[in-house]
Amino acid sequence: MSKKNNLLVAASGTGGHIFPALAVSKEVEDEWNIHWLGIQQRLDANLIPQKYNLKTLNLKTPRKNIFLFYQYIKILMSTFQIIRILKEKKINLVFTTGGYISAPTIVASKILKIPIIIHESNVVPGMVTKYFGFLCNYVLLGFKETNSYLKNCKTIFTGTPLREQFYKFNFLPEWVPKGNGPLLIVMGGSQGAKAINQILYESLEFLIKKQFRIVHIVGESHLKTFHVKNSKNYIQKKFTNEIAALIQNCDLVISRSGAGTINELMEAEKPSILIPYPYSKNNHQEKNAMILAASGGSVLINQNNMSKEVFEETLERIFKIKSKKGKKNYEILDLMKKNMENNNKIKSKNEIKKYIDYFLKEF
């Protein structure tokens, strides 16, 4: 058997950075030895398989613009650490998904003339992609629209890779409320979302009265604040590993609009109400949500405009029953479903694998 080359995967932070990197790693692990680089304070080590040779750096992520002077110093110091790692592990190629760990990794790789691929999941590119992307051999895009922001980069549209469970059908978990009412999945991303939790809490009586079945992923940090006793039609969880099954089998998703969520909804062809996080960098969550809203598969509600009345009126409109030829259906919901089916889907991890494996010919 020929000796494998070494791939460094640099990914840390939220699920939006980590899950695409995990999907790609799994896809290429037969051809590459995977080494994972993350930030100790910004990575759940339990998510990374032991075989991926995890290495973490003790770096404090900047709270503000990474291009303030003192941040240059931090990046410089981190770069020296990463150069040492790249040499020790004899890395042949670097793949990263953005975030603070990416900047020094890209610089270190460029100094050592190691090829670099970065994947950008959001419509509006993050600061690392925007300012360091030109140093990379390829900038892979989750959305075609991102190309207009990166004129000086070698960009290729690949889509965003998802967790494996989204590429197969999953049965609804037994613990989900039973009944004939529409099933809502309410979630706020890996960090939880206080505003979404609050509006659901305020509207819970209305939802149960209307016979909605609700699975509420509240997020660990908000579990105590928004704890509501589970009932026949309402289940609250801080986290679940069965998110693909829930999304695939529900009627509507209510969520933030991180890039990962948008792509999961597209893969599952599932309608949604999207409430973008208003403080996301470059307002990227709203730009993400606009992709699905423009297609007619989602209703976009800005958090500043959100209220109990707006939320309940939106649900009533989506789930308004209309009789047609003696048959009752949700006309608006059915139209949203049809619009989601028309969204182009791409097997992203296969596309990304092609560009990673391209470099095998170079070694």
From Swiss-Prot:
The keyword Magnesium does not apply. GO terms for molecular function: UDP-N-acetyl-D-glucosamine:N-acetylmuramoyl-L-alanyl-D-glutamyl-meso-2,6-diaminopimelyl-D-alanyl-D-alanine-diphosphoundecaprenol 4-beta-N-acetylglucosaminlytransferase activity; undecaprenyldiphospho-muramoylpentapeptide beta-N-acetylglucosaminyltransferase activity. It holds the Pfam family Glyco_transf_28. It is a peripheral membrane protein. GO terms for cellular component: plasma membrane. It is found in: Cell inner membrane. Pathway: Cell wall biogenesis; peptidoglycan biosynthesis. UDP-N-acetyl-alpha-D-glucosamine binds at T14, G15, G16, N122, R163, S190, Q285. InterPro entries: GlcNAc_MurG, Glyco_trans_28_C, GlycoTrans_28_N. Its main location: membrane. Coiled coil: none annotated. SUPFAM superfamilies: UDP-Glycosyltransferase/glycogen phosphorylase (SSF53756). NCBIfam families: murG. Belongs to the glycosyltransferase 28 family. MurG subfamily. Cell wall formation. Catalyzes the transfer of a GlcNAc subunit on undecaprenyl-pyrophosphoryl-MurNAc-pentapeptide (lipid intermediate I) to form undecaprenyl-pyrophosphoryl-MurNAc-(pentapeptide)GlcNAc (lipid intermediate II). HAMAP family: MurG. This is UDP-N-acetylglucosamine--N-acetylmuramyl-(pentapeptide) pyrophosphoryl-undecaprenol N-acetylglucosamine transferase.
